[in-house]
Structure formats: structure tokens, C-alpha cells
Amino acid sequence: MPPKEEEEIPVPQRPPSPPPHTTFGVRGILPPTFSAFKPRDYRMPSPQAMNHVAWSCDGKKLAAVGIDKITRVWQPEKGMEARSATMFSGGHSDEVDHVTWNPTHPELFCTSSGKDRRIVFWDARQSRCLQQVSLKQSPLVMNYSPDGKTMVYTSAGHQMYFLECGQVQGGKETWSVRDKEIVSGSRAMFNHTGDGIVLTHHSEHTLRVLDYPSLTVRETPAAHVGGCEAAALDPRGRYLASGGFDSIVNLFDLTEWICARTITACEHQISSLSFSHDGEYLAIGSTGVYVDICATETSMPLHRVPALAPAPTVTWHPSRYVIAYCGQTKAREGGPAPVAVVSLFGALE
């Protein structure tokens, strides 16, 4: 029998009542009935974890990586069975760690592997990769600029680097390494206008906001005790959410760079954050076997989604109330072998 604490998912504590003007009722918003949905878990036998999932910009495709050298892409409205995935292989010589989609084109995506030190660019309409970029560092996390022409990535050595897309002879677009000042950081992402970068570091208690392309430090708000692991930008441009080892999520006002509110629903280290398309809801992945959904404007916990495994990645669909997340079940003595998992929660219809 597994320990009792692994059988039961704790109920998140409710914070004090929020100001009335921030509530859904006063603002005329009818939230989804999250408790009516059930997680849909898709298991794949594997000794490795599925560690990253990402939606295409139109929400029609979902990519997952982590268990091998292959990137799997589903069209969730048609099915999420393993056999229904389109397989993209041949770009990497070792396990793929991360995948991200071009924000301006629903068929273009890229993958990275820390072991083979490559970032590979793909077109979902073709089986072969468009380009392989070999690096001197092991890439960990990548993010496109809003125009899809620049890539920021962080390395296993916790440093930030850039790739740029340019035209070569014949009009073909090619990505190449851009030489810039090396800045330390564990995760980096562009702001919505592309003129700034949000940078977190696993061993620093502050966030850093840099101007781009100068990389001048603009803001350094204190965020977490013991390091910051996750960050997400509100699509409305109001808030920056950050999560760290202290199990707390902070919401920073992007106008004044003060902490507008704090979410304390989680009992575990925060690993991933994602805002819904309208910015009203925040999904929180952690080292616990659940995903929390909280209201952005009140920080109130709305629903705790039971998960088969801790979720290293959670991500909302770009236009619907659907969350994708992934992970790997734990090995139990006398129990079944661990399996990789990709899960969906919400209504795709």
C-alpha cells in the first residue's frame, strides 16, 4: 500500500475574502465549472518522463517531448492515442528536452536537446527538419520573440543566449547564433512587445527584467526565498506571475512592478505557470500530484486537478479553457512500471 500522503491530494487553503470589486460576479464574468471536468490521461510505456508539452499558436496541435529522440504532435480534436500522433525524428541524436511553437505560424516549431547540444527547427507539414543548429552549450528552455524572428534560450550552465532568423542567398530563412553579452539565467522569455526580457534564476530570489536588445537591467523585483523556477506573462499585459522553491506564486503589477497579490494554494515547489487566453485564470504545476487553477484577480483557488504525476509543464490552450500537462508516474514496490503521461483537462468542444 502506498503511504497515505500519496493517496490523498490536500485541499488548498482558501485565502481571506478578496475585495468585492475584483470578484467574478461584480465584473460580470461566469467562470467555467472546472469541477465538472475530468482529466484525460494518455499513458505511454517509457522509463523516461514526458517533460514538456506545447500548443501551436492556433491551438490545433499539441506537441510533447522527453521520452526519446522523437517529437510527437497530436491534433487533440481528432484523438490523443499514441498511434494518432505524428512522429518527427531524425533531427536529434539524443533525448529531446523542450519544444516550442512559432507564435506567428501554426505549423512551425522547434525542439532542443541538452545532450546533443542542438536546437532543431521543424515544419509540421514535413517529416524532415528544416534546420539543425549545433551549439557550444546544452540548451534547456527556449522561447520565441513575438515576431518569431528571434529565439532566446537558456543553457544547463544557467546562461542566456540568442538565435536570429535571417535571409540567405536564395531567400531561404536560416537561424544562426547571435553574439551578445552573456547574462546568467535559468529561464528567459520575451515580453509581449518584444522589447524586454523576463529572466529567472534557480538560485536568485529576485526576477530580472531587461530591455531588449540592449540587455540593460530595467527592474529587479524581489520574488522568492531560495530561487525562482517559473514565470508567465498575463496575455492582457497586466501581470507577471512567478513561482519558486518556496511554493508561493507572486503576481506583479507590470505598471508599478510591485507584488499585487500572492497565491499560497500550493504545498509544493512550483515548476510551471500558465495564464488562460483571457488572463482570468492561472494554472500552477508543482512537484505535487495535482495542478491548481486560481483566479488571477482575487488569487482564490478555484479547482485542484488530480494528476497521475507531478507536472513539469502546464499550458493553457491559446483560445479555450483546456490545460495540457505531462509527467511520469512513480515506481512503486510491487506495482506497475512507471509510464510517461500526457494529460488534458477541460473542454475542447
Located regions from the model:
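WD40-repeat beta-propeller superdomains and closely related acidic/aromatic-rich repeat-like regions
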Residues: 2-349
